[in-house]
Amino acid sequence: VGILELTRGEKGTQGTPAERQAECVAAARLMDLSWRGQLGLPDGELADTPPFAHALAAALRTVRPRVLVVPHWHDRHPDHFGTYHLTKRAIHLAALKKADLGGDPWRVQRVLLYQGNSDISANVLVDIGSVMTEWEAAIRAHTSQFAGGYVSETVTPEIIERRQGRLTYWGTLLRVKYAEPFEAEEPLLLDPLGL
């Protein structure tokens, strides 16, 4: 499992790019990621543009992920819905044999959309009760985001409690303590014995 950050968050209200970078490194350690990358696209400007899509497609060919987890297209944050549309183009480009991106073509098998700042029509729920301590520690590693109180409608001093409440709600649907919701755009094939 790895994370590719598209920007350095340089235009964010809280924290400097250096602070945010250090926080990302700390959170990655807490999550025990196998890799972490930084694409360096401009913060506040993520959109489905050919240069951005080529950069992301080249990264997909290098990293070769089977599954991508990206922000939902309905998120209120412009960079989040921009990431969704950019990712869809990059996935297509990465698979094209004649796309001049370097490396061998790569086809991502599955895209899951995560719940950010808006509601989603979740059709995949993952029991995360066993990793909630790590989940909270990874969020708290982003200390600059919690300095100074209220930042926006969604980034408040109560963000962890609010997100835990949301995870508790989704967990009740599975009869577990916490569940992370995702939306799969395509049907998932399940083992009927696993139901």
Q: What do the PLM-derived regions correspond to, one by one?
A:
Residues 1-63, 183, 192-195:
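Active-site rim/loop-helix segments in enzyme catalytic domains that contact anionic ligands
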